[in-house]
Curated annotation (Swiss-Prot):
InterPro entries: Hemolysn_expr_modulating_HHA (IPR007985), HHA_sf (IPR036666). GO terms for biological process: bacterial nucleoid packaging; negative regulation of DNA-templated transcription; negative regulation of single-species biofilm formation on inanimate substrate; positive regulation of termination of DNA-templated transcription. Keywords: DNA-binding, Transcription, Transcription regulation. The keyword Transcription applies. The record marks D44 as: Interacts with H-NS. Belongs to the Hha/YmoA/Cnu family. This is OriC-binding nucleoid-associated protein. Pfam families: HHA. The gene is cnu. GO terms for molecular function: DNA binding. The keyword Transcription applies. Modifies the set of genes regulated by H-NS; Hha and Cnu (YdgT) increase the number of genes bound by H-NS/StpA and may also modulate the oligomerization of the H-NS/StpA-complex on DNA. The complex formed with H-NS binds to the specific 26-bp cnb site in the origin of replication oriC. Can complement, at least partially, the absence of the Hha protein in hha mutants. NCBIfam families: PRK10391.1 (NF007703).
Amino acid sequence: MTVQDYLLKFRKISSLESLEKLYDHLNYTLTDDQELINMYRAADHRRAELVSGGRLFDLGQVPKSVWHYVQ
């Protein structure tokens, strides 16, 4: 799957807690390194969207000021 595919999957989730559960599940089940990298990028992107109040951003377009709040 691509980063965009994972991001669309993660956008169905509206809470950080649920996102972390899905992230943990995928982290243990995926074996391909490129798949893991794509999933990590999408999960981080979705975390940024959630901490910004639910605003949606294009991939690579999250403002630097938002990343400060992502844990």
